[in-house]
Structures are given as C-alpha cells and as structure tokens.
A protein has these predicted regions:
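Conserved AMP-binding/adenylate-forming core of the ANL superfamily
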Residues: 2, 20-51, 56-65, 69-73, ...
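Conserved AMP-binding A3 loop
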Residues: 32-34, 177, 184-211
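Structural core segment of the AMP-binding/adenylate-forming
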Residues: 49, 80-159, 295, 478-480
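AMP-binding/adenylate-forming catalytic core of the ANL superfamily
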Residues: 89-96, 106-108, 274, 386, ...
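Conserved AMP-binding/adenylation subdomain of ANL enzymes
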Residues: 207-225, 233-273, 287
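Gly/Ser/Thr-rich phosphate-binding loop
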Residues: 272-276, 285-349, 362
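Conserved ATP/PPi-binding loop(s) of AMP-dependent carboxylate-activating enzymes
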Residues: 354-360, 372-403, 441
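AMP-binding/adenylate-forming catalytic domain of the ANL superfamily
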Residues: 499-523
Length: 538
C-alpha cells in the first residue's frame, strides 16, 4: 500500500470514517472533522481569491486558535509555505522574519490581551520588505487600518466563501508526490550567525514525523485527549497537536498558557497527554497542591530548561504528574525521542531517549576534539539521521551544508552520550545558545539590539539561572566609559524591540570584555563572563 505524505493525509481518513468525531476543542466549542474540513476548504478558496499560489510564503502571526490550523492546512493544499511567527515577537524580530522569509503575505489579528499587533507592525521598516504584498487581518473591525507597512489590509473572511464541504478530493498520485516535497512551514531557530535561521520542513517530513509520534508515543487509546498549551508557531506545540489529530485524539487548544485555566481544562476534559517544560510543571504543582493533583494524565512529556529537575520529578511523579524526558529541535522535530517509561526515575526524566521513528532513525555521538565516534557512555556531539529531518535553512546554503555530515547526519550542536541499549541522553548545548522562555536564543541577537542603544559601544550576553529560571544577563562597554548610560533606561529601550523573555535581567558596564587568543584572533570568554555574572548575583 502506498502512503500519501501530504499534510491533508494527517486527518483525511478520520474525516471519511468519523466526520462527526471531535477534532478540536477551544473555549468550550467542539469542532468536528467535518466542520474543520469545511473551514479548511473555505480558507483555501479565500486565500486563492486573494492571490496566494503555489510556492508563496505566507507569514502567520496568530495566537493558538482553530484558524491557525485551518490556514496551515489550506496553505498546504495550495502548495504554499506557512512562515511561523511567535506572538511574543516585537518589531525587530518580526521584521527579520518577514524580510528573510521573503513572505508575500502576512496574516495577523488585530490584538490579543496586551498585544497590539498592528502597533508592533508599525514599528517594522516597510521599505526593506520588497516581497511583501498584502496584509490580512483576522478579527478585523471598524478600527482596522486600511493600510499597514504601506500595504493594503484585507479582512480575513473565509467563512463567506461558498464551498461544497462534501468531501476531500484526494490529489492525483502525481500531484500528491509534488505536494509532499514542497516546503510546508518555516520554523525559526537560533544559530551562530546574527539573527535566527529559518528551518524548512516539507509536507512529507512533517506528516511522516507526526505519524511516528502517534505510533511511538501510543496516542489514540479510548479516552485520550491532548492539551495544547504551547504555541502552534513552535515545533513542540504544532508537532504534538498534529500527532494527536493523526491518532484521532481530541486536541484542546489554549490561546495562551495560564496555569489556573490549564489545570481546569485538564480536569474538565480528562486530559491524558500534555507537553511542556519543567517550569510549567512547577507552576502546575503550585496551583494544585493536593496529594494527587491529576488522575487522568498518562504522560507529561517535558524538556528541562533549568536545573534540579530530578528533584522536581521525585516530588511530582507520585502526585499524578507522569513525567518523561524528551528530545527535539526545529531541525529534527519535537518529540523526536522519549525515555522509556519503565526506566528508573533518575533516568526516565533525562532528555533524550529512543526515537519515535524506531529503526528508521539513527543517533550517534562524536568526540568534538578527535572527531571519532564515541562508545556508549562517552559524551560528545549528538548526530542524527532520519527521513523526517529538515531540508535545510531557507536561503542559507552555507549554513545548511555546515549542519550536515558527509553521510547525511545532522550535527545537532548538543552534548550527550549513548546508552548501551542504543538510546541516548541529552546533556546540554555545546555552544553559547541560550534557552529563554522555552525558546533557543542566539545571544548575538540581543547583543546587536543592545549595541544599537544610545551611548553603547558593544555588548556581550550570557545565560545564567536566576531564582531557578534561565535568564539572559548583559555586559556592555559604554562609548563614554567615564559616564556610562543608565542601565535601567537602556533595558527599557531594548524592550521596545525585543520579546520580553529576551530582555536581560541585568546590565553591567565594564571597561573591557575578557578575551583569549586563538588562531582566528581574539575571542570573548563567555565562560568568564558567566562567572562574573554569577559573582555579581551572589
């Protein structure tokens, strides 16, 4: 039997077999597979009317909502690419993504909570976006501007389109093959160069991976339900949601993570699966102090972004938090692997595990100094080969080439080791990239914004742990060393262009940065800077 790996194949068979089964739940509203299919058809038709065509890039800047997923599936049917934009981003980051993705269209909503999307967009330099043609506004009202960034604004109104909604018209074998290999989404990830890179996944790499998750994580038993508390614009939120859909498992969408609301939803819908961070676990535990917090949960897959997570697991697992360590990235997908649940607690909660794809994926570890492959138990750089790996970094062939070995393994930049049974353990990032707010952040991105502030000559940023949370802190050299600018005022200036989780918790002025000589010139000693920061925080 030949399998189709278009994005529509993720749920097409469920629509045919159980059209009235619940697919999504948001704010108490149940959306069936039939209702979702009708919305996707209308959205596809509307986007085509607006001029979206195959190979176009459409930036989507929305909170978690049914429309996000409908737009995604509709774009995939057209053969266009969704450019995922984090709702936490501000003008600096939004401009970077729009410019570097070559997005022709931008879909956003008017506002949400304290976020005024239109106002943020106004801070983007319109003249440096030659590809952008049209802006589409969800939830438009009488206050919606006629233009943004000197481009026309059209109201996003797919529900007004008339379609049959009767069936999924499967593409021909030839057309399906062409769609499978088209880029379906660009995720953003950090890197060693200025600004994030755009990670390209095709319909095949994405749809095949979420099927691996559904099977490998044993999704879809009677009564299973997923709470999507993470943003759909990131791999952890999107991959888990699509895997649940592939397994015909209801997905409860949260537009914004709030621990009180999330706790209520878990109990109300008898949620069995949730994915997040150790910080989310801490907040759940504080919100639900009873001896057994949740009785329905089967799996709380988590990534540890701070220290002392083993102590946390020892406390929470007996209280109804079935914690399991995971591994993933934008390049290899989230939920790439998970630890076996029968392992001792201390091993079960470590990052890494066994690939969801089973024998179709291969993991090895290489010594960064000798470049020899490591035996089990010896640490080195984790390398991964899988049919669902990303296809490259958009418009960045040099970075793409550097990311792979000659025999097709992705060089993750992560430190880890193999176990004797073939599973692996993730230990830490090998480079300077920081994990902030649940996202990988390149410090040079923050450094560039700091250096652009008045009276700042240059800046260096490192990550430290403050009150149990990973935070960025900064050192800067003032143009006038005798009279440096006010640190608080400088950080307020940074806040105008960077997402809140990227803003340094502290800024200290120094006369010079610690450096060390190398064959390629002077290099900044980030380890020394981190030590200096920890000393100041004592």
């Amino acid at each position: 039997m030949t399998h189709s790996y278009t994005l529509r194949s993720v749920y097409a068979h469920h629509f045919l077999q159980a059209p009235n089964a619940t697919m999504l739940i948001q704010e108490g509203q149940h959306i069936s597979y039939l209702q979702f299919e009708q919305l996707v058809q209308k959205t596809e038709a509307w986007l085509l009317q607006q001029g979206v065509k195959r190979s176009d890039h459409v930036a989507v800047w929305l909170i978690n909502r049914v429309e996000w997923l409908a737009i995604f599936f509709a774009l995939a049917r057209i053969g266009a690419t969704l450019v995922a934009v984090n709702t936490k981003y501000r003008s600096h980051e939004v401009h970077y993504i729009l410019a570097n993705s070559h997005a022709q269209f931008l879909i956003l909503q008017l506002n949400f909570r304290k976020i005024d999307f239109a106002q943020v967009v106004e801070g983007v330099e319109a003249s440096s976006l030659p590809h952008l043609k049209t802006i589409m506004m969800v939830d438009a009202d009488d206050n919606t501007p006629a233009t943004l960034l000197n481009r026309p604004v059209v109201r996003f109104l797919p529900t007004l389109v008339q379609t049959s909604g009767a069936q999924i018209n499967a593409p021909s074998v030839t057309d399906a093959s062409a769609l499978e290999d088209l880029p379906v989404i660009f995720f953003t990830t950090s890197g060693t160069t200025k600004g994030p890179k755009l990670v390209v996944h095709t319909q095949k790499t994405l749809s095949e991976h979420v099927r691996h998750i559904a099977t490998g994580y044993q999704f879809g038993a009677s009564g299973d339900a997923l709470l999507t508390a993470l943003p759909l614009c990131g791999v952890y939120g999107l991959d888990s949601a699509l895997a649940a859909i592939a397994a015909r498992m209801p997905v409860v969408l949260m537009d914004f993570f709030d621990v009180a609301s999330a706790s209520q939803l878990i109990k109300q819908h008898q949620i069995t699966h949730i994915f997040g961070s150790d910080e989310m676990l801490r907040r759940f535990a504080e919100q639900n102090p009873e001896p057994i917090a949740f009785t329905s949960l089967k799996l709380f897959g988590f990534a540890a972004f701070s220290a002392r997570f083993i102590e946390l697991a020892q406390e929470l697992i007996p209280r109804g938090f079935p914690m399991c360590g995971l591994y993933g990235s934008s390049e290899v997908h989230s939920l790439f692997s998970a630890q076996h649940r029968e392992l001792p607690l201390e091993e079960r909660v470590l990052g890494g595990g066994t690939p969801a794809a089973g024998s179709r994926a291969s993991v090895r570890v290489r010594d960064p100094d000798t470049l020899e492959l490591c035996a089990a138990g010896l640490s080195g750089e984790i390398e991964i080969k899988s049919p669902t790996l990303f296809k490259g970094y958009f418009n960045n062939p040099e970075a793409t080439a550097q990311a792979f070995t000659k025999d097709g393994y992705f060089k993750t930049g992560d430190l880890g080791y193999l176990r004797s049974d073939g599973s692996f353990v993730y230990q830490s990032r090998m480079g300077d990239t920081m994990r902030l707010g649940g996202f990988l952040v390149d410090p040079t991105e923050i450094e560039d914004v700091l250096a652009a502030q008045p009276n700042i000559e240059s800046a260096q940023v490192v990550g430290v742990e403050i009150n149990g949370q990973p935070r960025a802190v900064a050192f800067a050299i003032a143009k006038n060393k005798q009279c440096p600018p006010d640190a608080s005022a400088t950080l307020k200036g940074v806040a105008k262009t960077l997402a809140a989780f990227k803003i340094p918790a502290h800024l200290w002025f120094v006369d010079e940065f610690p450096t060390t000589a190398s064959a390629n010139g002077q290099k900044f000693q980030r380890v020394k800077l981190r030590e200096m920061a920890l000393e100041k925080l004592r």
